[in-house]
A protein has these predicted regions:
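N-terminal ligand-binding/catalytic initiation module
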Residues: 4-9, 18-132
Length: 132
């Protein structure tokens, strides 16, 4: 490949990478605004999108279909209380969750979680990771 053509290709590749980086930053800003205080979920989304954003940028049909917007938004989030009696006879109340992320290829994966240490961000992260 002639040197001038090679430089042109390298410049174009850098431009594509920068454009994807800008779009990734903008997309992540929107995800964070819709899902504040869910840092585990933000991290999972960033890791996946940093890999797929260049492909999405080169295939506008996926942008038009809003594929990224669809995969980061759960279809359903169920939040419920779980009252129970501990070994001392004391009533305890925990919050339970079920995140149903995407049913495009069949039933939802995952289960119910109601441990006191979990929160919505952790469970959205787990559900998001299971759709790939």
């Amino acid at each position: 490949m002639p040197q001038t053509m090679e430089k042109s290709v390298q410049k174009e590749n850098r431009k594509d990478t920068n454009m994807a980086g800008n779009n990734l930053t903008q997309f992540m800003d929107r995800v964070k605004a819709k899902n504040p205080s869910e840092t585990e979920f933000h991290q999972a989304v960033y890791e996946v999108l940093s890999s797929v954003m260049p492909f999405i940028e080169k295939n506008p049909k996926y942008q038009k279909a809003k594929i990224l917007e669809r995969i980061v938004e759960p279809e359903r989030v169920l939040m419920f209380r779980v009252p129970w009696v501990d070994d001392k006879g004391e009533v305890q109340v925990n919050r339970g969750f079920r995140i149903e992320m995407n049913s495009a290829i069949g039933p939802y994966k995952g289960g119910l979680r109601f441990h006191p240490s979990v929160n919505l961000g952790i469970l959205k992260f787990l559900a998001f990771e299971q759709i790939f």
